[in-house]
Amino acid sequence: MQRAALLSVLVLVPQLVGGLPGVPPVDCSDIYQQDNSRPSGVYTVYPVGDTYGVQVFCLPERTDGSLNFYRPWDYYRTGFGSADGEIWLGLENLFQLCLRRKYELLVDMEDFEGNKAYARYSSFSVGPEVEGYKLEVTGFTDGGAGDSLGSHNGMKFSTFDKDQDVSSQNCAELYLGAFWYERCHNTNPNGVYRWGSYGSISAIGVEWDTSGKDMTIL
């Protein structure tokens, strides 16, 4: 299998465009609709209502491994990190965003040699906590990265202290991450940030595994 070190950018793209002047932005698209000259950076969005603001970095990504993503359920539920660096928005915030609008998901990758690939999904949503923040993702378009997320469709979110995968093992504990694991994963974006390929232990890293390729996302 081929292995490559990749940088990943995860982008939620609204299918239905909103954002009227004077209305608090629900997500990053509202901010850029108001002024498309704004650079990537820290902004406040209001996924629940105009009294509850959440700082986000548009576009969020794993950048340098400075933030520990091996965390318990409560952190993943509410969110953690810094809006001007690495960040996890929070499962509840993702759920509230998906209640308000329909979204696409773009997984965009580029290695340190400038090679680019992406995977796009025309429908992305996260269910409520009572359903384990279940992932719904369909409508795959291949931009060279392959479909590493399809097998995770319909799965509940798991952390090492809240195992909700369908494996007999605790996938989050085994692969040092947190995700919508199945048995266990074809992608592990919240895994260990590593500099380069590490052969047999690649599965614990920030990985996008496709047919014929094993891409380690940095």
Regions found by a protein language model. Name each.
Residues 1-218:
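Mature extracellular or lumenal effector domains of secreted proteins
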